[in-house]
């Protein structure tokens, strides 16, 4: 049986198919960012209160450096559909879901992980049949990290460095899969 939760987030009606995990306290952050047209925008991040100070500081530094992030909206604006949010290149944090292919809650379900410019920094894993699973599927042109293209997160990137300074782990450094968009604590 599904639980339906209604929440008002800065005037937006957010409907989630599941409640947040027990003991998780979520916070709503308004952050400034520079979009791909070079214009300042205000984004909304739903995150675990335990990382809200870190995220506030990181996004302030990214904003000061004019680091481009296309959009930052709650996943509820995409019907809580992670693939749809990633295809729109939406940077988001909290999303109540399990780790792909398991029953374990993801760090996103705890509000402890954030995905940055996910279209250009896809999650890539090899399936048992040897084929690649690319998320978002439209991120296929950005799988080859030896190519040069805009908005790519690497170990030399400011976004990477700021998250590392704040004690986050980067999915792009994982061995089992590569999740270039993903930072978690």
Segments and roles (model prediction):
Residues 22-25, 105-111, 164:
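Extracellular/periplasmic catalytic domains that process cell-envelope and extracellular macromolecules
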Residues 1-4:
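Positively charged n-region of N-terminal signal peptides that target proteins for export
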Residues 10-18:
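Hydrophobic h-region of N-terminal signal peptides that target proteins for export
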Residues 84-119:
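Mid-length scaffold segments of soluble, non-membrane domains
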Residues 18-38, 91, 96-102:
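Cell-wall polysaccharide-cleaving catalytic domain and substrate-binding groove, primarily
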Residues 51-58, 112, 155-159:
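Stable alpha-helical elements in mature extracytoplasmic
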Residues 99-101, 114-185:
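Catalytic cores and adjacent binding grooves of peptidoglycan-active enzymes
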Residues 25-86:
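Active-site acidic/histidine clusters and adjacent loop/turn architecture
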